[in-house]
């Protein structure tokens, strides 16, 4: 499965969503910038996408909730060790009722992995961040 991420101004990203109603796109707004997520087995509809392969997943992203993005630059020779450690975190997320969905993403043409987790809300993320599970990871 391919996963694409693009970013831009809120206005432009909203127009992208309206222009592609048939696509499963998720629009997220942040500090003056917006991000659109697209998961598909086809080519990207974005002009300038960041392309990833999905290596672990659960649930379906929805427009509601709170998203955390973990960007992790990993050199190519360190990828196998990193992926094993990252996959070891998955059972803790699977057992967390506050997690709506997640994707662990391997970069296709870059070195920065992306781990996106959707939570029920910011308080859910804060509780997890303060937990022993998070601290040991």
Question: Which residues fall in each region the model found?
Answer:
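Short S/T/G/P-rich N-terminal loop/turn motif that feeds into the first structured element of a domain
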Residues: 1-98, 110-112, 124-130
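Short beta-strand micro-motifs enriched in acidic
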Residues: 105-107
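Mixed-charge, glycine-accented linear interaction segment located at domain edges/termini
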Residues: 133-136
């Amino acid at each position: 499965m391919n996963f694409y991420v693009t970013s831009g101004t809120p206005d432009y990203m909203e127009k992208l969503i309206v222009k592609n109603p048939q696509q499963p796109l998720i629009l997220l707004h942040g500090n003056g910038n917006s991000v659109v997520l697209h998961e598909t087995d086809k080519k990207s509809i974005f002009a300038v996408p960041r392309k990833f392969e999905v290596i672990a997943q659960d649930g379906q992203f929805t427009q509601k909730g709170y998203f955390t993005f973990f960007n992790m630059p990993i050199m190519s020779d360190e990828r196998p060790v990193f992926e094993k450690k990252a996959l070891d975190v998955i059972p803790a997320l699977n057992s967390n009722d506050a997690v709506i969905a997640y994707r662990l993403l391997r970069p296709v043409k870059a070195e920065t992995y992306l781990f996106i987790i959707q939570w029920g809300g910011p308080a859910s993320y804060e509780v997890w961040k303060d937990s022993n599970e998070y601290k040991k990871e």
